[in-house]
Amino acid sequence: MPEMVDSNSTPSSSTGSRTVLLLLRVLTFVFLLIALILIAIVKQTDDETGVEIKFNDIYAYRYMISTIIIGFAYNLLQMALSIFTVVSGNRVLSGDGGYLFDFFGDKIISYLLISGSAAGFGVTVELGRGVPSNSFMDKANASASLLLIAFLFTAVASTFTSFALPKKD
């Protein structure tokens, strides 16, 4: 005689993947927030001239903060949609359009995040040549590192959204 399985005892794979996706979005949100705070507070005063240098004085750091803000806004929207989906069991954006929005949105945002991280790393290396390590470079490098980690979480989330795409024959 077949065994009866209680369907309420373990979550379905769909619920499990939605929860994992929400967790990835929360982690991305946290890392983007910390990266944003770090790059926004970074400043250095030149000992010789007394000129204060901030992130907005360097184009690559401006680009980096722009990618953080865009990623932050997108991720905030996706977190809200994910929370609604996990709590209610229904998607806000139903049909193929919602899945395509998730899929392409995650792809585009992940590419933006990695390009922002690369720009931050690149300019930090260039500016740091021949200069002893300082707080400005260390904080900017830490922000680029956190942005890289946020990219990794978004890339993994992108994999989950690609699995959710409706199968077309």
From Swiss-Prot:
Residues 1-21, 88-107, 167-169 are cytoplasmic. Glycans are attached at N141. It is found in: Cell membrane. The chain crosses the membrane at residues 22-42, 67-87, 108-128, 146-166. Residues 43-66, 129-145 are extracellular. The keyword Transmembrane helix applies. Keywords: Cell membrane, Glycoprotein, Membrane, Transmembrane, Transmembrane helix. Coiled coil: none annotated. InterPro entries: CASP/CASPL, CASP_dom. One of its GO terms (cellular component) is plasma membrane. It is a multi-pass membrane protein. It comes from the Eukaryota. The keyword Glycoprotein applies. Belongs to the Casparian strip membrane proteins (CASP) family. NCBIfam families: A_tha_TIGR01569 (TIGR01569). Homodimer and heterodimers. This is CASP-like protein 4D1.
